[in-house]
Amino acid sequence: MAQKINKDTDIVVTSGCVTSYSYPKYGFNLEALGDEATLTFGELRAIAMSSDKVALHKFYIMPTEILEEEFDMNDLIKQLRMEKPYNEARKVFGLDEDDIITADSFIDFIKDSTVDELKEALKNPNLSGRLSDITVGLYRENEVHVDKLRVVLEHNNIDLGAFISDTID
């Protein structure tokens, strides 16, 4: 059996949210997509083993670096029991099993995917929220075509005309 990660080991987490994401219990507030905070493995494990695990499984926050040379990210993912959502995301994004999932993984997939690939990826309940949120953010920055926005809005049962009207107002 692999050695366990010490509860005091620092782990860098990255925000997967376009808007702010905070976790007051552990004293961090991530203001924008890609912002980073450092938590201990003990804190991250407490999140992963509680009802708050949705933050990790749905990629609101993503561990991106373990500050201990003897462990790699796959050790961390296994010890946090997050193999399933991470393996699914790697498959959808076309990443290798050792690749780290970051906010850029979502951005690159959204920009580089076809409309059909994005539509298929939105069927994954662990990815759909972040894909939707980030696609809307990229559209607002004129970085993705309206067809991708349309797919996201349809997936979320939002009318394109109403969305555009709300955005203009």
PLM features: residue spans?
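Charge/polar-rich, low-complexity and marginally structured segments
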Residues: 83-169
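Compact, well-ordered interaction domains used in eukaryotic information-processing assemblies
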Residues: 2-85
